[in-house]
Amino acid sequence: MDEFYELLNEYNKTKSIFSEKAISIIKNSIKIIFEKTQVKAIYWTQYTPYFNDGEECTFEIHSILVSTDTLSTFDEDEKSSNTYAIDYLDSKVFSDYEIELISNLVRILQDEDIAEVLKFSFGDHVAITATEEGISIQDHNHY
């Protein structure tokens, strides 16, 4: 029995180290975007849907947006004209290099293997806003 709990303890330590490193990489990617692009804020929601047509409801990242305005939070109903959904990054606004940096972060955030870390680190049913000042977390209603 002791062997099992030693193994479980080792697993939890490794998981914790992985989570810390993964969040550090995400925060560093965000920092680089702020330093090397015109992006001033990054926003996303993350939650487990309440209902999914009978399929299993799984935690996911949703609504990733970037803004060239300095915002402390995003209002999804009142997006500024300088706020862009990541699926529609305008090459007239963003350079190929900027789009590449943003896309690299998006790939990390949308990787299903990192979902558990994001849920543990930031929560479920939340909206995340990242600015140069840091990351803020608000409750998010997604009915």
Spans of features found by a protein language model:
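Acidic interaction surfaces
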Residues: M1-Y143
